[in-house]
Amino acid sequence: MLRRANRGNVAQKSVAQDRRNNMEVVHHGGKASVTGSCHEMRADGQALLIDCGLFQGADERPLAVEFSLGHVDALILTHAHIDHIGRLPWLLAAGFKQPIYCTAATAELVPLMLEDGLKLQLGMSPKQSERVLTEVRRLLRVQDYQKWFAVQPKRADSLWVRFQPAGHILGSAYVEIRRPNGEVVVFSGDLGPSHTPLLPDPQSPERADYLFIETTYGDKQHEDVQSRGQRLRAMIERSLTDGGAILIPAFSVGRTQELLFDIEQLIFSQQIDANLPIILDSPMAQRVTRSYRRFKQLWGREAKARLQMHRHPLAFEQCITVEDHRTHERLVNRLASTGEAAIVVAASGMCQGGRIVDYLKALLPDKRTDLILAGFQAEGTLGRSIQSGQSSVWIEGTEVEVNAHIHTMSGYSAHADKADLLRFITGIPEKPKQVHLIHGETSAKQAFAAELTQLGYSVL
């Protein structure tokens, strides 16, 4: 059972100035941090929650939902990453019974992601976990992209909501909320970068009177996404000269599929040895990848073109999947003892859990090992500690030497960079009355705020 904690999380209030209709947004997470997204919009006698995510890394705090829920009409989910849905079990434990709206792909991914979290983080039995998941499934309400729906159809002054493709992961969306007075409030969720081959680029909203936008990379420019496959090839070639394994920690949703997509292209174009073992050691990632294949209609133009060539970019024959834990243990021991070459893609992306941890414990001390960090490593995570160049790290109570070669590679971020964010905002035909910066570290938000202020935007 989930119990309510004695102390709650501090909510940060951000008031969008509309005195006549008394609209406000209260942040229950994800305002001053990258994780734990949970925003409550109160307007026109109604209230919506947008996401209810898990706090991770340095943001970790008690997860019990202490804020009032009796007045909340619905929960809107932008996508299925755990830092946007991970507090759902605590929300239910606090008595939430209202509809949970999301896209079809997100509705398929949410139970998968939560099941993994309930098992790993709470140690729930399958029976306990299924009880929670059954209730989540009961509340889920699937909505199509680009179609308005009323939160309270029986009210003449209902808030209306619309999902637009966000390009972040499969099923991801930014949320448009239309008020009775015609104003539109937009919550970006997590926006994807431009020019990724697997998902289409996000398009700017037609209107956003109040914009709440993520700033994960508000102060950074990614390397060119279109050339990332060649950078990956060069990194693999360099790593193979060391001998040993190439480890790539990757989130089960999004980055794993992007990596497989590029590796398939390198094999197809004969730029890496077709006999090099490509190991996907993440049961969750395997299930998610099957979901990606089922929702091919959401893929981008380049990905669909490969399908028309009868290629299988997420299920190519060289990709070996590891199902059971015994096989996983044998593989870790084999790579540690033989030093043979292989590419291992395993969760989790920030090295905070999952099967990648076993590989790190066994192979970080080996100078033949190469570790490619292909995404954001939040402060306080094992991934950030390794990335910062520490000579040793603590893993599950054991001090582990870091002799492996550590590489950081951009281009695989599922987040928009500074240029993408600016393009999204400046693409809105009329400037928002207010732009609220959320989901970012302080330095990123400050730098991005300065850019927007110079362009004449009102930034909070």
Q: Language model features by range: what are they?
A:
Residues M23-I76, H81-I85, W90-E258, E264-I272, ...:
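His/Asp/Glu-rich metal-coordinating catalytic cores
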Residues R42-D44, I177-R179, P202-P205, R228, ...:
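Short, solvent-exposed amphipathic alpha-helical segments in soluble enzyme
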Residues M235-A374, E379:
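Hard-cation-handling environments
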Residues W394-I425:
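Generic long, charged, amphipathic alpha-helical segments
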